[in-house]
């Protein structure tokens, strides 16, 4: 998992935005990818 502050999310490698269809409500940038949350949408 990854963290956006204290929020746990799912790390997506080599993406700069969250993939659709998972119900993500937000994200933050991480090294070589993006962290999308919530972790269990």
From Swiss-Prot:
Disulfide cysteine pairs (residue numbers): 2-35, 4-28, 18-36
Location(s), subcellular: Secreted; Nematocyst
Gene3D superfamilies recorded: Anthopleurin-A
GO cellular component: extracellular region; nematocyst
Keywords linked to the UniProt accession: Cleavage on pair of basic residues, Disulfide bond, Ion channel impairing toxin, Nematocyst, Neurotoxin, Potassium channel impairing toxin, Secreted, Toxin, Voltage-gated potassium channel impairing toxin
Major subcellular site: secreted
Alphabetized Pfam families for the sequence: Defensin_4 (PF07936)
Taxonomic superkingdom: Eukaryota
Stated family: Belongs to the sea anemone type 3 (BDS) potassium channel toxin family.
Function: Potently and selectively inhibits voltage-gated potassium channels Kv11/KCNH/ERG. Acts as a gating-modifier toxin that shifts the voltage-dependence of ERG activation in the positive direction and suppresses its current amplitudes elicited by strong depolarizing pulses that maximally activate the channels.
Full protein name: U-AITX-Bg1a
